[in-house]
Every structure is written in C-alpha cells, then in structure tokens.
C-alpha cells in the first residue's frame, strides 16, 4: 500500500485496505511517499494529483482503475507498486 506523507491518502492498495478491514486488522503495512515529488506521476494526465487528494479528502471515490500512479526511475516510468517492498509479517502482529 502506498500513502501520501502529507494527507495520508491511500494512493495504491485500496483493495488491500478493504480486505484488511474485512478481517479485522488494525494495522496495514504501507510505504509513505512524498506525492508532491516530480518523480511521481498520475495518469491519465487529465486528472491531477490535486484532484486525487481533494477527491479522497472529500470522500469521493474515483471508479476502480481510473488513475495509475507511476514513478520515474532512471528515466523510465514504472507503476508505484514497483517500489513497494514485500512484507512478510505474522498476521497476528497486525490485529
């Protein structure tokens, strides 16, 4: 799961959040990102980062797969999940 460091808006991993809630987890491993970084890009370009944050803070959800969050690494764009580490924890630690 990827989360903006300023607003704590979930950028990637919404389905994981819903699954975690459904099984009663109180904690969810996440990577905290500086969404204002120029290295992070939202597509399509018709939706801005500000649109994403504003919609989330107002409780408005975009339909699934409306946006993709990409990160520029060494001149190439990759889905943000590329930098999310594998997390292997005993699920009991998250309750």
Where are these regions (language model features)?
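Amphipathic, charge-rich alpha-helical segments that serve as recognition/docking helices
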Residues: 35-76
């Amino acid at each position: 799961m990827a989360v903006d460091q300023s607003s704590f808006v979930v950028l990637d991993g919404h389905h994981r959040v819903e699954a975690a809630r459904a099984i009663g987890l109180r904690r969810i491993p996440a990577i905290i990102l500086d969404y204002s970084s120029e290295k992070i890009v939202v597509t399509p370009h018709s939706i801005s980062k500000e649109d994403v944050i504003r919609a989330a803070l107002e409780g408005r959800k975009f339909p699934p797969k409306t946006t993709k969050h990409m990160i520029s690494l060494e001149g190439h764009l990759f889905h943000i999940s590329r930098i999310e580490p594998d997390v292997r924890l005993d699920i009991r630690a998250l309750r």
